[in-house]
UniProtKB/Swiss-Prot annotation:
The record's note on its domains: Consists of three domains, a large central CORE domain and two small peripheral domains, NMPbind and LID, which undergo movements during catalysis. The LID domain closes over the site of phosphoryl transfer upon ATP binding. Assembling and dissambling the active center during each catalytic cycle provides an effective means to prevent ATP hydrolysis. Some bacteria have evolved a zinc-coordinating structure that stabilizes the LID domain.
Gene Ontology CC terms, in alphabetical order: cytoplasm
GO biological process: AMP salvage
Keyword ATP-binding attributed: yes
Protein name (Swiss-Prot/TrEMBL): Adenylate kinase
InterPro entries for this protein: Adenyl_kin_sub (IPR006259), Adenylat/UMP-CMP_kin (IPR000850), Adenylat_kinase_CS (IPR033690), Adenylate_kinase_lid-dom (IPR007862), P-loop_NTPase (IPR027417)
Entry binding sites for AMP: R36, E57, L58, V59, G85, Y86, P87, R88, Q92, R157, R168
SUPFAM superfamilies hit by this protein: P-loop containing nucleoside triphosphate hydrolases
Reaction catalyzed: AMP + ATP = 2 ADP
Length: 212
């Protein structure tokens, strides 16, 4: 099974991707996580990608396509995966279809701009186990202590400020809305209300994928 999660920054793709991937025992591949891993390396590619991310701009198709192809052609993903954050535009979608021939399902997370901004600006994660929290909606039960592993160290995304987030949303709309129309005609496109809480969204996705 190959499932693509589409939606703007802060729509909840990463949270649901991890949950559903664990439930159906498939890898969760998040383009943003791949980029953040690359950025930590001392390479010219890392510097180039980091410059785009810091400015709230999308990384050029040629770079994105090559990075994602290198990952997806690994034998670790031969049985399927949940793909989060790719493709982002028509050119990427057609590149993806050029080397992936299996049937796919596309799930789009629909969320208002106002809620997206709060989700992104409030987002942080446990540095140890990567559990995601939000200063507006989902804080640890005990202050500064991770609910899952007990760690007291957290990561805050440096590229997340209101100006950059708003720009990322606008860039996303310009780039990705034509892709939504393209996939709507595929017969495998599904929309979920991303404004619901985590549990409700998870249930909606399980129904789409016909899993318990």
């Amino acid at each position: 099974m190959i499932v693509i999660f589409l939606g703007p920054p802060g729509a909840g793709k990463g949270t649901q991707g991890k949950k559903i991937a664990k439930k159906i025992d498939l890898p969760h591949i998040a383009l943003g996580d791949i980029f953040r891993t690359i950025i930590k390396t001392s390479t010219s590619e890392a510097e180039l990608i980091n410059n785009y991310v810091k400015q709230g701009e999308l990384v050029p198709n040629a770079i994105v396509n090559q990075v994602i192809k290198n990952f997806l052609l690994s034998s670790a993903y031969k049985n399927g995966y949940i793909l989060d954050g790719y493709p982002r535009n028509l050119e990427q979608a057609k590149f993806f279809e050029s080397f992936i021939k299996e049937k796919i399902k596309i799930i789009y997370f629909d969320v208002s701009d106002e809620l997206l901004i709060k989700r992104v600006l409030g987002r942080y994660s446990c540095k140890n186990c990567r559990k995601i929290y939000n200063s507006y909606f989902l804080q640890p039960k005990t202050d500064n202590v991770c609910d899952v592993c007990g760690s007291s160290t957290f990561d805050y995304r440096k590229d997340d400020n209101e100006e950059v987030v708003k720009k990322r949303i606008e860039v996303y709309k310009t780039e990705t809305y034509p892709l939504i129309d393209y996939y709507k005609n595929s017969g495998n496109f599904y929309l979920v209300n991303g404004s619901k809480n985590e549990q409700e969204i998870e249930i909606d996705i399980q129904k789409i994928l016909k899993i318990n």
